[in-house]
Structure formats: structure tokens, C-alpha cells
Amino acid sequence: SNNIKILKNTLVTTYNFSDHLIALEDKNVGKPQDNEKPELVLHKIRTKHTILANGHIERFITFRNNDLPGVMLAASFEKYLNRYGVVPDESPVIFTNNSSTYSLLKSLTDLGHKPKAYVDIRDQKSIEKETVELLEKFNIPFYPKSEIEGCEGQKEVKKVSIRTKKNQISKIKTSMLCVSGGFNPDIHLFTQSK
């Protein structure tokens, strides 16, 4: 259609009232890095209707020393694995409260890697059947109704402490912990417009 313009490599930074948007276009993407001047274009856009498709943001779960190198959001780990072909760790511990980590578990086992443990806050009845079957098939230590109490290590993750449903502490040596606390819709631009 003649009234549609596609702006690639463009970030909408502001969504003001009456469908007035500010966007920053980077014209350097795909050009040699030796450009002396970045070519950025600021667009002021006025629309009759705006459709936002911003996606979602994965939530973290709070625990002791969750800022150590080696603690990573599960979706980020999976993106490295499936999009870039990079395996950040061959046997991470996975900590979750939702079903989104099944695809990470499947991707790891399909590549021949075995997580050291799968820790889920939910009780076993609430966890999807295919997740439990995959854990059993590959004999992956499974901790339902449990949580990560904290990570140990000075400059990186060396161990994780798991508080089990019986209130006992299990420690597992690992260098990587993948965490998923579920997802929130990314509504930041939408809230600016109101």
C-alpha cells in the first residue's frame, strides 16, 4: 500500500498522546564499521492507529547471590543455543516456576547435553507430563516443589543450594544456573501513550 513505510533497524523511543511516536533509525547497520560518522535519523511519526507488538520480558526469581556470573535467564540461554549455535554450558541447573523451560530442556537433550538438575517451584502434579517424561528418560535429577536458596562462589557460580519440599538443603556443583520466573508483556511504550 502507498501509505505504509517500513523502517528497518529503527527503535521507537517515545509514544506520546494522540498516536505521536518518536523513532530512531540506524542507517549504519550492515555497513563497514569504519564509518566515521554514525548515520542516525530521528523520525516524528503521526498515525491514525498504532499497533504495538512488543513481545514479552522474562522475569527473574530472587535468591541469594543471583548476580554472580553464571546465572542467566533461561530464554537467553536457549537463544544462544538455538539461534547462534553457542552452548553457554553443557550441564546447567534449570530453575523455574513455569512450563517455558521445557523447550530449553528439549534443546539441550536433543544436542546430547544433560542438565545437572531441574528445580521447579510447582508440585509434580502441576508440571506438564512431557517435562516429567523427558526428565525421567534422561535420568535428570528432578526437584519438584523446591527452590534455589542461593548460589555459592566468589567470582562465578560454583554451587547452587536447593531447598527441597522437605525443607532440606541439597548442594550441586555447577557453573551455570538458568532461571525462568515466567513472562510479563512488554507494555512500556503503551503506558507512555496514556
Regions found by a protein language model. Give the residues of each.
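Residues forming the flavin
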Residues: 1-194
